[in-house]
Amino acid sequence: MVRVAVIRFPGTNCDLEMAWAVKLAGGDPEFVWHEDGGLDDFDAVIIPGGFTYGDYIRAGAIAALSPILEEIRECAEDGRPVLGVCNGMQILAEAELIPGTLTVNVGNRFICDWVYLRVERTDTPFTTKYQEDEVIRVPIAHAEGRYYYENPEEIEDNVVFRFCGPDGDVSEEYNLNGSVGGITGVVNDDGNVLGMMPHPERAAHRLLNSDDGLRLFESLVEWCRS
């Protein structure tokens, strides 16, 4: 059985949905409190969304200082998959485990909506069950989700997901938070650490209005098994 650690911080609030999605994909999720640590026996690590430490200073800044981030860094260096969703992506960015940073949305407002994403890479542990340029539908819910990188052309190979229209067109019309290049999911240079602002765990069953996110977790579990 593929063991997946779901990390909990004060203010985490998407952990149950994340564990449920991992189970649907055939994995064995286990909650790990950030102060407890102990990730050696896990095949993959997930940092779910929420508002860790109330988003004080800025989203993810305090959580990124937790000692468990050093364990997560070691997991990444070992080649194990690490996924950070929404606040999890913010934490990964603060810990410099993925390129770029997240800042407040254009308009300085919280955005909660369904969006379309274009899959840019299918060679990561998280996207093998998608097709390149496939359009998927998942929700977003964040206030500080605008991705920024000073020279985005330098990280073209790191981009995994972009905001797009239903036909796959990338334009500012569909870029709800103002992210540079419509980027909303990136990996590290090794491809095994993914940060993404949209919530695939909230689109893991047809009863949730979309099951497009389930394949991300199926990709993860299958990759770990192989």
Swiss-Prot record:
GO terms for biological process: 'de novo' IMP biosynthetic process. The lineage of its organism: Archaea, Methanobacteriati, Methanobacteriota, Methanomada group, Methanopyri. One of its GO terms (cellular component) is cytoplasm. Part of the phosphoribosylformylglycinamidine synthase complex involved in the purines biosynthetic pathway. Catalyzes the ATP-dependent conversion of formylglycinamide ribonucleotide (FGAR) and glutamine to yield formylglycinamidine ribonucleotide (FGAM) and glutamate. The FGAM synthase complex is composed of three subunits. PurQ produces an ammonia molecule by converting glutamine to glutamate. PurL transfers the ammonia molecule to FGAR to form FGAM in an ATP-dependent manner. Part of the FGAM synthase complex composed of 1 PurL, 1 PurQ and 2 PurS subunits. It holds the Pfam family GATase_5. This is Phosphoribosylformylglycinamidine synthase subunit PurQ. The keyword RNA-binding does not apply. Its EC number is 6.3.5.3, 3.5.1.2. The keyword Hydrolase applies. It catalyses: N(2)-formyl-N(1)-(5-phospho-beta-D-ribosyl)glycinamide + L-glutamine + ATP + H2O = 2-formamido-N(1)-(5-O-phospho-beta-D-ribosyl)acetamidine + L-glutamate + ADP + phosphate + H(+); L-glutamine + H2O = L-glutamate + NH4(+).
